[in-house]
């Protein structure tokens, strides 16, 4: 499958996977890509399958010469679902912002290497973290 960006999906998936453990292939559909990060474990004493995490997720789609994205910060619960939530702990917030900015920069650089831009989606007005200048 070739996306509207004229780049084959299989090659993009390989490039996205090379960015690290962020790509969730099972949640990528057609021209919709899903990335996430389980940045901070809430309780390490629980069995792994019962743990919850603070983190973030990004969804992106191709559009003429660019990818647009939306992202959220929140809780990855023990059922394996993301819920957008306000982060009250400043240390957790800092960790989420740091990992999100780091990933965003690497994603932006990777897309630039194939002559694509990375931009917020037109309807994404409530950005909790400023990712680029």
UniProtKB/Swiss-Prot annotation:
GO biological process, one term: positive regulation of DNA-templated transcription
Keyword Transcription regulation attributed: yes
Gene3D superfamilies, A to Z: Sigma factor-binding protein Crl monomer
Compartments, as annotated in UniProt: Cytoplasm
Cellular component terms (Gene Ontology): cytoplasm
Transmembrane segments: none
Keywords: Activator, Cytoplasm, Transcription, Transcription regulation
Region (Essential for activity): 99-122
Transmembrane among keywords: no
InterPro entries, sorted: Tscrpt_reg_Crl, Tscrpt_reg_Crl_sf
Broad class of where this protein is predominantly found: cytoplasm
Biological role: Binds to the sigma-S subunit of RNA polymerase, activating expression of sigma-S-regulated genes. Stimulates RNA polymerase holoenzyme formation and may bind to several other sigma factors, such as sigma-70 and sigma-32.
Annotated family: Belongs to the Crl family.
Alphabetical list of NCBIfam families matching this protein: PRK10984.1
Protein name: Sigma factor-binding protein Crl
